């Protein structure tokens, strides 16, 4: 649809492996290096990993060289997943919950500014996912904002990227106070970090704590109980930080939201920054040093 390539997962770089087994690091990077927009339905187990589990079978450098795909979590078959590669981000969309499992992108200093404007761009359904599709009417009179996961402010560098950020597969029902307040402040802080460090790798998405969830609209879009965001910066000493924000109107000091990436992985069940060398991944995810993340927009 719309000229995009639609590729069955079994034929696309062997991205998905045996059930509940994460994709290999090399396959993640190969996927990240594809330039076209694609949709990949992740429902078919295929090849085995091309590196033994538990080894640093990776030639990625800790200083950021060869870092294509650092932002991608491990693809899995343990939950409904359609992988959507867009110009400015990659999304794992869940056709059951009607919201993304996660959205990931590489935010560079060059991407935080540009001439692409959000004014006049409507939220619109994503024709690359099967019906029934979420549309903007599902949110009408729901009491929730259409909350971007990859924010429009991170896509000012390109008009197509900006337009794609308004696809409903990049959107979750979000409390209004959170959307315009603490969550918006975190988005602004990420852009400042990208400018300060040259680039960062970001993953965010909904947190579903409960067994049963509130839904909105005729398509029964699931309302998350919280949202997560994890951020990686490379360099001589790679650092990572995680955040959990409850989906409500309560405001807190920024430090109350901070978590290690390991803790966010425990809460969400995702394996973040899966293409990093294992030793680097373990190091940056184990703990967070807030002193290594100077803040300006989070006060």
Language-model segment annotations:
Residues 3-8, 15-299:
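Domain-level detector for secreted/extracellular nuclease and nuclease-toxin modules, and
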């Amino acid at each position: 649809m719309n000229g995009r390539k639609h590729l069955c997962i079994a034929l696309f770089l062997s991205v998905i492996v045996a059930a509940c087994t994460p994709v290999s690091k090399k396959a993640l990077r190969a996927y990240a290096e594809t330039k076209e927009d694609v949709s990949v339905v992740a429902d078919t187990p295929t090849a085995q990993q091309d590196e033994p589990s538990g080894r640093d079978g990776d030639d990625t450098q800790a200083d950021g060289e060869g870092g294509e795909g650092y932002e991608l979590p491990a693809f899995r078959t343990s939950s409904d997943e359609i992988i959507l590669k867009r110009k400015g981000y990659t999304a794992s969309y869940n056709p059951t919950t009607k919201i993304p499992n996660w959205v990931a992108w590489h935010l560079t200093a060059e991407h935080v500014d540009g001439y692409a404007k959000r004014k006049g761009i409507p939220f619109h359904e994503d024709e690359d996912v099967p019906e029934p599709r979420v549309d903007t009417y599902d949110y009408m009179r729901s009491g929730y904002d259409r909350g971007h996961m990859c924010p429009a402010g991170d896509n000012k560098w390109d008009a197509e990227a900006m337009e794609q950020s308004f696809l409903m597969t990049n959107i979750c029902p979000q409390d209004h106070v959170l959307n315009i307040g603490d969550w918006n402040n975190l988005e602004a802080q990420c852009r400042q970090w990208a400018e300060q460090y040259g680039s960062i790798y970001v993953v965010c998405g909904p947190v579903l704590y409960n067994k049963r969830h509130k839904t909105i609209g005729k398509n029964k879009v699931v309302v998350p109980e919280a949202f997560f965001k994890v951020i990686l910066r490379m360099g001589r000493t790679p650092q990572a930080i995680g955040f959990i924000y409850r989906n409500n109107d309560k405001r807190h000091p920024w430090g109350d939201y901070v978590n290690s990436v390991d803790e966010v992985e425990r809460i969400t069940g995702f394996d973040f920054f899966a293409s990093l060398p294992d030793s680097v991944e373990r190091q940056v995810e184990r703990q967070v040093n807030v002193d290594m993340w100077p803040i300006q927009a989070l006060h």
